[in-house]
Amino acid sequence: MGKLTLLLLAILVWLQYSLWFGKNGIHDYTRVNNDVAAQQATNAKLKARNDQLFAEIDDLNGGQEALEERARNELSMTRPGETFYRLVPDASKRAQSAGQNNR
């Protein structure tokens, strides 16, 4: 009876070792689970970005307001008869904001 008990104990130890430390064991499972969670978070961020880009594309395809807004903001374009004014902060405020941005 003693040899059978030792054999079963050895098999149990071997199975536990392979469960915890072997290939596809608990450690591999937790590592893969963490990798999947990180990838899902990245995918969620990218999906939100894609949704935003698709909304912008739809807006640009659908109407003139988005094109006009973009032309005014990025290219400083104006309509005939309009005057474009750009407000530039004075030097002390620019130095303060530059100092805060460098932190």
From Swiss-Prot:
Coiled-coil residue windows: 31-71
GO terms under biological process: FtsZ-dependent cytokinesis
Family as reported in the entry's similarity comment: Belongs to the FtsB family.
Gene3D superfamilies xrefs: 1.20.5.400
A Pfam family reported for this protein in Swiss-Prot or TrEMBL: DivIC
Any one Gene Ontology cellular component term annotated for this protein: cell septum
Organism: Escherichia coli O1:K1 / APEC
Membrane side Cytoplasmic: residue ranges: 1-3
Domain of life the protein comes from: Bacteria
Record function comment: Essential cell division protein. May link together the upstream cell division proteins, which are predominantly cytoplasmic, with the downstream cell division proteins, which are predominantly periplasmic.
Key words, A-Z: Cell cycle, Cell division, Cell inner membrane, Cell membrane, Coiled coil, Membrane, Transmembrane, Transmembrane helix
This protein's record includes keyword Nucleus: no
Record's protein name: Cell division protein FtsB
Periplasmic topological intervals: 22-103
Parts of the chain that traverse the membrane: 4-21
Places the protein is found: Cell inner membrane
Membrane topology category: Single-pass type II membrane protein
Keyword Acyltransferase set for record: no
Subunit description: Part of a complex composed of FtsB, FtsL and FtsQ.
